[in-house]
């Protein structure tokens, strides 16, 4: 069972992420926006990508490594997931996750932060996160999950003058 087995119907995305995870670590973008409607598996994609990034075999093996198994099980010490059942993600939760993001990874090459439903942040909360996304620590990768590129969080993340679809294409081409 590969780290990618839970991703159904997204073979092109899986192939791109495999290539990125196994490529030059210096060329990996440190902030990602993973979009898809509720139930589409965007959180599964984020976890699989995190598992591949933290795994010595980069997620290319037929069986997940111990590190990949830990990421997929939610027990890896260098991968933190912020998920909420509340209506909004609070500013204190984001401040705590920023503090975590600044710590050096303990066992793996990256400190990976996954934020599910990033569109649940209010504008002031998004502004707190913005600096970290724009200038992440050299050892941190942010995986942000949202139901669409045009969610209310994106205008704060994208640079002025660049459409959401163009920014996503630009990110994928790197």
Model-assigned labels for residue ranges:
Residues 13, 85, 148, 164-166:
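Short, solvent-exposed coil/turn elements at secondary-structure transition points
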Residues 51, 130-132, 158-161:
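Glycine-rich, phosphate-binding/catalytic loops in enzymes
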Residues 1-124:
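Clamp-loader machinery-focused feature within the broader ASCE/P-loop NTPase space
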């Amino acid at each position: 069972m590969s780290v990618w087995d839970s991703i159904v119907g997204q073979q092109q995305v899986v192939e791109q992420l495999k290539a990125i995870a196994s490529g030059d670590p210096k060329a990996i973008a440190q902030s990602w926006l993973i979009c898809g409607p509720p139930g589409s598996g965007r959180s599964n994609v984020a976890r699989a990508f995190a598992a591949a990034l933290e795994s010595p075999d980069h997620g290319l093996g037929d069986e997940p490594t111990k590190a990949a198994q830990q990421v997929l099980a939610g027990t890896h010490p260098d991968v933190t997931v912020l998920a909420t059942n509340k209506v909004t993600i609070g500013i204190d939760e984001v401040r705590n996750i920023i503090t975590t993001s600044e710590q050096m990874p303990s066992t793996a090459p990256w400190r990976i932060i996954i934020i599910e439903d990033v569109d649940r942040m209010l504008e002031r909360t998004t502004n707190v996160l913005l600096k970290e996304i724009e200038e992440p620590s050299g050892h941190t990768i942010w995986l942000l999950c949202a139901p669409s590129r045009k969610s209310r969080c994106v205008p704060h993340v994208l640079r002025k003058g660049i459409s959401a679809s163009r920014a996503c294409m630009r990110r994928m081409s790197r």
